[in-house]
Amino acid sequence: KFNGEIYLMDAQKMTLYTFDKDQKGTSNCYDGCAVKWPPLMGNAEMALEKGYSLIERKDGGLQVAYEDQPLYLWFKDQKPGDMTGDGVKGVWHTARP
């Protein structure tokens, strides 16, 4: 919770984002996109809370998703609570439950 808003974050309390160009259960952020928007990666041994799942990326890795929406970090966020990626190019948004 930040400024009265509830949003998703990783274990280090960094803000997570969703990408409008993704489809449910499918990431469309690779190469240069994934450098700026690192996918939140997971593994098969992870204990996931309700609503979270793992999706397989075309590069073979497992990415954490919430309600089937792949989750990402933003390379310009420097500390917990930063939300500088919200609204970038009109297609990136803070992930919310």
Sequence positions of predicted segments:
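Compact beta-sheet-dominated domain cores in extracellular/mature segments
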Residues: K1-P97
